Swiss-Prot record:
Gene Ontology terms: cellular component: membrane
Record-given protein name: UDP-3-O-acylglucosamine N-acyltransferase
Organism: Pasteurella multocida (strain Pm70)
Domain of life, source organism: Bacteria
Active-site residues, as the UniProt record annotates them: H241
InterPro entries tied to this protein: Hexapep, Hexapep_transf_CS, LpxD, Trimer_LpxA-like_sf, UDP_GlcNAc_AcTrfase_non-rep
Enzyme class label: transferase
Pathway where this protein functions: Bacterial outer membrane biogenesis; LPS lipid A biosynthesis
Gene: lpxD
Organism classification: Bacteria, Pseudomonadati, Pseudomonadota, Gammaproteobacteria, Pasteurellales
Amino acid sequence: MQVYSLQELAQQIGATIRGNADVVVESIAPLDKATEKQLTFISNPKFRSLLAQSHAGILVVSEADVAFCAEQSNLLIVKDPYVAYAVLAQYMDSTPKAASGIAASAVVSASAVIGKNVSIGANAVIEDGVTLGDHVVIGANCFVGKNSKIGAYTQLWANVSVYHEVEIGQHCLIQSGAVIGSDGFGYANDRGRWIKIPQVGQVIIGNHVEIGACTCIDRGALDPTVIEDNVIIDNLCQIAHNVHIGTGTAVAGGVIMAGSLTVGRYCLIGGASVINGHMEICDKVTITGMGMVMRPITEPGVYSSGIPLQTNKEWRKTAALTLGIDAMNKRLKALEKKFEKK
């Protein structure tokens, strides 16, 4: 079991030390469960009451938290404990690492360009013209279609499908079951008969992008679908053809984006939101969970829609009132006209 000293961890995050610099921990745990062999952190002041009784070997805290800690606690004091936790979690990450090399059962085209220290798992298929950068990891049963490019240090977990002509940048992480570059939902209707429109655009994904499990990103009809740098997309999202998502935007689970939508930079899209296509959302917009966006958003800010959870009895009353709004409006207008005549 690898161990990490207070001094070593402090160097990773530029922390101020209080306590025994030689104390060591093995892993990270929640504040209320951490043992003397574990590190923990606090990022919300409402949990300060737990600090004095914590058994953690190391506590990551802000300057404002120090007074609430036991005198004997070993502290890493930082400006932002949550960011420090994220950095340390990466440093101490125990997720299994794939060994470089190509599994015997993998099928790799002779025309594929394979970088240094690449790992290709069992039963993976790498088609003609594919380029894999250095240190790329392709998990078991993955498919990478013709002429696609995957940048250095990008990892595809098992069972990811990357269609043809897709470009994925460096340091990306794509979780199992994701599909990148499938056909967009493009059809023409000829007197009741649907005629499929071939989707010949690409998907272009920037650097440091993460895509969750079972998320689907469709290829463009003509122009590409684009995901810019540092975008994070959660599980079970649908990104339709020709969507363009700006740098630094975060998309929570279950979001549906219709075709030709442009989402600005540094937006936060809450879970299960549904967003209409052929329109734009400006930079720095937050859409709360289950938002239904039918019109463009031109001003930064927080936007919500829908009715928050109520008891069934309350909801039925609300629904009944909503259905009666038109009739009430007509009665109000009639009363206004009546009083105007007087």
